[in-house]
């Protein structure tokens, strides 16, 4: 974020203050987290609490590449509207070595299994992210 002067401020103005919808895809989803740990600890936007860490999947190939079944995570306050039309068992294609560990389970909308649960979709309010 710091590599592009004014980018973080512009994003915060639009998304936090004006509630402009935001969709982060792949690394864009990872930027939503509080911190990232790729090469060094780096602050993220902090819109979805959590950390991005290297996938730990003993016996499995990293980067994680391929089709995986989505598992829709049921939240206490009901499904997020972005999930309308998606069901557990639907497929998504992943190419990544790093995964978000979400702090608040209410923000985890879907995951895939790859040596354990791997975050696939996160969201809150008008902020969404997909790893695929």
Can you name each region flagged by the protein language model?
Residues 1-67:
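Cysteine-nucleophile active-site neighborhood
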Residues 11-17, 51-132:
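Amide-donor transfer/coupling interface in amidating biosynthetic enzymes
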């Amino acid at each position: 974020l710091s590599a592009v002067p004014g980018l973080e401020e512009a994003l915060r103005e639009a998304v936090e203050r004006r509630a402009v919808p935001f969709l982060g895809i792949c690394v864009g989803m990872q930027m939503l987290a509080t911190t990232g740990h790729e090469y060094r600890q780096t602050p993220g936007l902090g819109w979805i609490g959590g950390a991005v860490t290297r996938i730990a999947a003993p016996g499995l190939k990293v980067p994680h590449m391929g089709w995986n079944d989505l598992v829709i995570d049921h939240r206490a306050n009901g499904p997020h509207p972005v999930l309308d039309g998606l069901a557990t068992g639907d497929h998504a294609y992943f190419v990544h070595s790093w995964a978000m560990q979400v702090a608040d389970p209410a923000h985890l909308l879907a995951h895939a299994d790859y040596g354990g649960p791997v975050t696939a979709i996160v969201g809150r309010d008008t902020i969404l992210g997909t790893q695929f």
